[in-house]
């Protein structure tokens, strides 16, 4: 039994399932999760001292790599002045100005402590601003664990949503409508049925919780037009894609302007943080200037703001996103080439610093229905073989992979060599 095995058994005695977020339990791939002791650059190290090339990056925020000296120094300097004040700080202003500078659609921004807080607050604001109750989300997209967002599609294309978790009353879920990602016709049909009841559309511009599904050409622009036609707000959830896909997020990459944007992960440099922002007239509707209530004791925490600012400043340096995109393309296409070499059917998607691969015979994967038909058993086998090779991928066939600037030629080549060996073994099985 490894030290990680021992820790997992110990954790299950005091923590539900032994983890503090379900995907960490390895339920999607089987076996025991690796308990991590430290991380540096492109690597993480488990409790048994084993070193892995990391393609999870704490689920996205580690764009510069783990334990980056600029972020570490910013945190240590901030700690000297105290941990939390529950009062305004100049750091909050500096962070707000930096976000607004980088994302043109954001005119004002409110800091919170998590991505879930950001999406939950943005939806409440959209409902209050429009005086409408219903929201529209997309099948396979994840926006945090607020009650109104843990909803799946009903039994027909135009039926009301059904709770996807116990503990959510159907009275809550009925206000959440679910459309098909990358299918404008499904969105139009729902708006035609509820033309004056939908407050907002919320969408991951690149769906990162059904692996990695970019929008097809014109999809985001079509959603913008539908929102304008029916007087609904468009919320782009950039908790995962913000400052990872491009300097101005996925919205900048694809050329679409939302009314509200949610952010998280990246703007904390690895610290717990989130934010939502957008049009000034909408943001002025939030307390204390408006009637929609939102608050948080740790919102704008000085340690998180310091870490985030250090990362954001580094991301503004010349050539950062070109490097990140090139590395991501190289690893994704390398996986595909290795799979093809050994006759393993695989499709790939990638954009900016995100990538995904799917064990399927389909050439392209563009929606949740296709994702659910992929070979998850083969993924689990591939996952553990790569883990044995010292490559740490997301432990679920439904999660995206992430590159960092710390991933160099050595790490990329070692990863692809490992993939080649694993695919060769799978082909013989």
UniProtKB/Swiss-Prot annotation:
Identify the PROSITE patterns for this entry: AA_TRANSFER_CLASS_3
Q: Where in the sequence is N6-(pyridoxal phosphate)lysine found? A: 265
Enzyme class label: isomerase
| HAMAP family from the UniProt entry | HemL_aminotrans_3 (MF_00375)
The source's domain of life comes to Bacteria
* Keyword terms: Cytoplasm, Isomerase, Porphyrin biosynthesis, Pyridoxal phosphate
Q: Name one GO molecular function term.
A: glutamate-1-semialdehyde 2,1-aminomutase activity
**What PANTHER family does the record tag this protein with?**
GLUTAMATE-1-SEMIALDEHYDE 2,1-AMINOMUTASE (PTHR43713), GLUTAMATE-1-SEMIALDEHYDE 2,1-AMINOMUTASE 1, CHLOROPLASTIC-RELATED (PTHR43713:SF3)
| BP-aspect Gene Ontology terms | protoporphyrinogen IX biosynthetic process
- What are its cofactors? pyridoxal 5'-phosphate
Family of this protein: Belongs to the class-III pyridoxal-phosphate-dependent aminotransferase family. HemL subfamily.
Enzyme Commission number: 5.4.3.8
Protein's name in the database: Glutamate-1-semialdehyde 2,1-aminomutase
* Record's catalysed reaction(s): (S)-4-amino-5-oxopentanoate = 5-aminolevulinate
Pathway-wise, it operates in: Porphyrin-containing compound metabolism; protoporphyrin-IX biosynthesis; 5-aminolevulinate from L-glutamyl-tRNA(Glu): step 2/2
Q: Which SUPFAM superfamilies match?
A: PLP-dependent transferases
Q: What is its main location?
A: cytoplasm
One matching Pfam family? Aminotran_3
User: What cellular-component terms does GO give this entry?
Assistant: cytoplasm
Species of the source: Shewanella pealeana (strain ATCC 700345 / ANG-SQ1)
Gene that this sequence comes from: hemL
Where is the protein found, in the record's own terms?
A: Cytoplasm
**Subunit-level organization:** Homodimer.
């Amino acid at each position: 039994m490894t030290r990680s095995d021992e820790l997992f058994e110990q954790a299950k005695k005091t923590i539900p399932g032994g983890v503090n977020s379900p995907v960490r339990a390895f339920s999607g791939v089987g076996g025991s999760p690796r308990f991590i002791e430290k991380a540096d650059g492109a690597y993480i190290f488990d409790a048994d001292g084993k070193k892995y090339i990391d393609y999870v990056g704490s689920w996205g925020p580690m764009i510069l790599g783990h334990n980056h000296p600029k972020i570490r120094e910013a945190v240590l300097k901030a700690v000297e002045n105290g941990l939390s004040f529950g009062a305004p700080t100049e750091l909050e202003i500096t962070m707000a100005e930096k976000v607004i500078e980088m994302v043109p659609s954001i005119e004002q921004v409110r800091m919170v402590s998590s991505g879930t807080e950001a999406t939950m607050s943005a939806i409440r604001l959209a409902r209050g601003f429009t005086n409408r109750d219903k929201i529209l989300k997309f099948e396979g997209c994840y926006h945090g664990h607020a009650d109104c967002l843990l909803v799946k599609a009903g039994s027909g294309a135009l039926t009301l949503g059904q709770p996807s978790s116990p503990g959510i009353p159907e009275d809550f879920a009925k206000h959440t409508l679910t459309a098909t990602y990358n299918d404008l016709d499904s969105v139009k049909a729902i708006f035609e049925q509820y033309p004056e009841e939908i407050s907002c559309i919320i969408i991951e511009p690149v769906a990162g919780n059904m692996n990695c599904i970019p929008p097809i050409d014109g999809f985001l622009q079509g959603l913008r037009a539908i929102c304008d036609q029916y007087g609904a707000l468009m919320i782009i959830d950039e908790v995962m894609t913000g400052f990872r896909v491009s300097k101005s997020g996925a919205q900048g990459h694809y050329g679409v302007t939302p009314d509200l944007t949610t952010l998280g992960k990246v703007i904390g440099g690895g610290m717990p943080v989130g934010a939502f922002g957008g049009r000034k007239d909408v943001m002025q509707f939030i307390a204390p200037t408006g009637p929609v209530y939102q608050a948080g004791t740790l919102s704008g925490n000085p340690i998180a703001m310091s870490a985030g600012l250090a990362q954001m400043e580094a991301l503004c340096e010349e050539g950062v996103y070109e490097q990140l995109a090139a590395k991501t393309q190289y690893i994704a296409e390398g996986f595909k080439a290795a799979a093809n070499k050994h006759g393993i059917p695989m499709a790939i998607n990638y954009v900016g610093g995100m990538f995904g691969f799917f064990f399927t015979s389909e050439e392209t994967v563009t929606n949740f229905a296709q994702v659910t038909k992929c070979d998850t058993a083969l993924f689990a086998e591939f996952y553990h073989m790569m883990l044995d090779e010292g490559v740490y991928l997301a432990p679920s066939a439904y999660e995206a992979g992430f590159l960092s600037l710390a991933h160099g030629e050595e790490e990329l080549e070692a990863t692809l060599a490992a993939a080649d060996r694993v695919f060769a073994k799978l082909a013989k099985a």
